[in-house]
Amino acid sequence: MKAAVVVANEDVQYQEIEEPQAKPGWVKIKIKASGICGSDVPRVLNHGVHFYPIVLGHEFSGDVVEVGEGVTKVKVGDRVSGAPLLPCMKCDDCQNGNFSLCKHYSFIGSRQQGSNADYVVIPEQNAIPFDPSISYEQGAMFEPSTVALHGLLQNDYQGGRCVAILGCGTIGIFTMQWAKIFGSKKVVVFDISEERLDLAMRMGADAVINTTKENYMEEAMAITGGKGYEYVFETAGQVPTMHMAFELAANKAHVCFIGTPHADLTFTPKQWENMNRKEFKLTGSWMSYSSPFPGKEWDLTAHYFATGQLKFDPGFIYRKMPMSQAQEAFQLYKTPGLVKGKILLTNED
């Protein structure tokens, strides 16, 4: 089969590799769409892979073409997405249902062959069937949707509250949608891109705020009557938005860092004191899994995509490119700010 193989730093080659087979308990999927995740970019451009050669890709969808012995959950012909985590299922964290925290895990697309290929194989339990009314493009967005929902579930999310979403990338837009689905009073999305903020409004945000404006904080607080936001979800992983989260939080709020920082993070004593004075809870969120594995995050994504309450917009996708152009796709990320949205690598029939 053909695959986009990372053979060296900044070197992705579309080449022939051995085609995997479905062993007992596993399924083989013909890949239709595979998204480039932000975590894949440093793997290709900054020596971030675990080993060479490696096939990346962990946000994907396709059709089941082969099932191994004993498989009962899915059948040949099913349209599926895939949960990429392969937890050990034996450690204390796994036994307690905290699969994201497993220290002995493997992972499709970083520690073993991923979905930037004609085919990928995954355990039966990692295959998430979805309704044929859901497109393959949507199916490739299951993983970022589940990351967003996991953040809400980590914070005992309740409706009827004001919610701030910091960052208007794919995960930020999904976080906004989940907050709306579960009954928020008002959801406000913050970003520096008018294009992305327009997308957030189309997708259902109650208000959007461009943080490059001089008086954006006054505008943000006025929406809540000066009380601040009961839930603040930081999805950008940027130092300014992490500072902003502390300032936007209401008394007794829940502040959740979903975004992963890539620079040193420092707070002034005054900034940090917000947490003391407001007595808010600061929580991290990692990946997207719960018990029973892979978790309600995945089941609910399939359900709400099928009902149409979880929405998809062409604006999610920056560009669709053939799998054979993976090298060119990753090169686009070298221009700061160029890629707005998801790049999907697709296979021709």
How would you describe each model-predicted region?
Residues I134-E214, E218:
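Mid-domain Rossmann-like dinucleotide-binding core that forms the NAD(H)/NADP(H) cofactor-binding site
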Residues A3, H243-E247, K296-D349:
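C-terminal hydrophobic helical "lid"/dimerization subdomain
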